[in-house]
C-alpha cells in the first residue's frame, strides 16, 4: 500500500512528503495492470506534460549502475500529487535554499518512476512525444535486449494533438483575462472612463522555435486564427550571488511566442477543457 505522510522523511537535501510503492517486479506489474485501462488520449496528455516540464533520464550512478527515471518537477504540488497517485510514486520536495543568482528559490515538488513501471509508461507516451522523443528511445534502449518498435513521428490525429497540446500548455502556456480601461469623450465633451468587456488571451512561450511553429501549423489547420509568432531576443543578465567570485554575465536563450486572443482563445480553452 502507498504510505502517505506529512512527517516528511529527509532524503539528503530532499524531503519525502508521500511515500509511493517501491519499484519491484511485483509492485510494478500491479500498477501496470491498472494503467492498461487508461485511454490513448490520456497518454497523449501525459506526453504533453513530459515534453513540457518532465524528464526522461538514463544517467548512471557514480558506481556505474543505471538510474533510469521518468518524472516531472513543478512548483505546483497539486499536479505532482495527481501524477504520484496515478503512477503510485513518491512526492518529494527539495529543501528551500537560494539559487545561484542569489534569489530565493521557490519550493519544487518532484515525482519520478523507475523500473518496469517506467518502461511501460515510456512505451505508452513515446508515440505522442514531440520534444523528448530521442530521450524516450534512449531510455528504452537502455533496457537489455529490449526491442525498439518504430512509431510514426508527429503523425497525430486532431484529438491526439489537442490532448498533447493541453498537457504541454498546462506546463508551458497561460490563459488570462485582460481588462482594459479607456478614456472617452461623450457628445457633451465630457471625459469619462470606459471599461471594455473582459478579453480572454492565451500565450505559449518556449525557446524551441520548431515546436512553436508545429503548434501554430496544427492549430491553423483546425481553424484557429494565430497571429504571427512573436520573438524576443535573449538578453544578457547576471548569474550568481552578488558579491561572490561566481558572479558573471550570461546570455538567456531566445524566446518564441504563440498568441491567441478574443474568440479564438475562448474556443481553444473550451476545446482543451475535456
Language-model segments: residues:
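Internal intein/HINT superfamily modules and their associated LAGLIDADG
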Residues: 1-274
Amino acid at each position: 500500500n502507498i504510505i502517505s505522510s506529512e512527517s516528511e522523511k529527509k532524503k539528503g537535501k530532499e524531503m519525502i512528503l508521500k511515500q509511493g510503492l517501491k519499484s519491484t517486479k511485483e509492485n510494478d506489474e500491479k500498477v501496470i495492470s491498472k494503467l492498461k485501462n487508461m485511454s490513448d488520449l490520456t497518454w497523449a496528455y501525459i506526453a504533453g506534460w513530459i515534453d513540457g516540464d518532465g524528464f526522461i533520464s538514463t544517467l548512471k550512478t557514480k558506481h556505474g549502475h543505471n538510474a533510469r527515471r521518468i518524472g516531472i518537477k513543478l512548483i505546483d504540488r497539486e499536479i505532482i500529487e495527481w501524477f504520484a497517485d496515478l503512477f503510485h510514486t513518491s512526492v518529494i520536495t527539495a529543501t528551500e535554499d537560494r539559487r545561484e543568482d542569489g534569489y530565493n528559490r521557490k519550493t519544487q515538488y518532484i515525482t519520478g518512476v523507475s523500473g518496469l513501471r517506467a518502461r511501460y509508461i515510456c512505451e505508452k507516451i513515446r508515440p505522442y512525444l514531440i520534444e523528448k522523443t530521442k530521450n524516450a528511445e534512449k531510455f528504452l534502449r537502455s533496457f537489455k535486449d529490449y526491442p525498439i518498435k518504430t512509431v510514426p513521428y508527429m503523425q497525430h490525429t486532431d484529438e491526439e494533438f489537442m490532448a498533447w497540446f493541453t498537457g504541454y500548455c498546462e506546463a508551458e502556456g497561460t490563459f488570462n483575462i485582460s481588462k482594459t480601461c479607456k478614456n472617452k469623450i461623450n457628445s457633451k465633451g465630457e471625459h469619462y472612463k470606459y471599461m471594455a468587456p473582459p478579453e480572454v488571451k492565451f500565450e505559449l512561450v518556449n525557446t524551441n522555435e520548431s515546436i512553436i511553429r508545429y503548434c501554430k501549423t496544427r492549430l491553423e489547420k483546425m481553424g484557429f486564427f494565430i497571429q504571427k509568432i512573436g520573438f524576443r531576443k535573449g538578453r544578457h543578465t547576471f548569474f550568481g550571488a552578488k558579491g561572490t567570485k561566481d558572479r558573471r554575465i550570461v546570455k538567456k536563450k531566445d524566446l518564441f511566442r504563440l498568441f491567441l486572443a478574443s474568440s479564438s482563445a475562448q474556443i481553444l480553452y473550451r476545446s482543451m477543457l475535456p
